[in-house]
């Protein structure tokens, strides 16, 4: 089965590498917590031990996940300034008097609260390939809105 290719900005790769380094460096602390918790006796009723093991398991799962993403990622090249929306662009949309700004990134980096939307999201899909000044209809689960593309950076 073919591995999924993840699309990441260079900033996204740097953030993942920082998180990976932090998780790897926490391994010894987690091992020490498990060792200390074992000293409390019966492991079947030892909440500290169970908690430490769960934290260790979550960290190892996240380490494997990040390593997989980094090993199967493609860097989004900084798009040239042009009049067509592509992956990596920041787009300013206008709906009457309301303006919204989105940066189109790969799904791993998506963070709607920070204005980073996935190229796989309804908004991302609606914007990709559209041109400056073009009207775009964006369908989301809650509504359908029409925006004009005011800026592409």
How should these model regions be labeled?
Residues 2-54, 58-61:
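N-terminal cationic and glycine-rich segments that engage phosphates or anionic surfaces
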Residues 76-153:
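Non-DNA-binding regulatory cores of transcription-related proteins
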Residues 24-27, 70-74, 131:
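Conserved NTP-handling cores and scaffolds of large molecular machines
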Residues 56-79, 83:
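Internal alpha/beta loop-helix hairpins
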Residues 17-20, 67, 127:
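A generic alpha-helix structural signal
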């Amino acid at each position: 089965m073919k591995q999924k290719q993840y699309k990441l900005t260079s900033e996204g790769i740097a953030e993942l590498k920082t998180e990976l380094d932090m998780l790897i460096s926490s391994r010894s602390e987690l091992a020490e917590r498990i060792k200390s918790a074992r000293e409390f006796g019966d492991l079947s009723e030892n909440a500290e031990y169970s908690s430490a093991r769960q934290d260790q398991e979550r960290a190892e799962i996240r380490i494997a996940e990040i390593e997989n993403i980094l090993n199967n990622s493609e860097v989004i090249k900084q798009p040239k300034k042009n009049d067509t929306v592509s992956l990596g662009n920041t787009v300013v949309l206008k709906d009457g008097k309301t303006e919204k700004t989105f940066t189109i990134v790969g799904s791993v980096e998506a963070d709607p609260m920070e204005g980073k939307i996935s190229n796989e999201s309804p908004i991302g899909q609606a914007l990709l390939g559209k041109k400056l000044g073009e009207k775009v209809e964006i369908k989301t689960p809650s509504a359908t809105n029409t925006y004009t593309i005011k800026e592409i950076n």
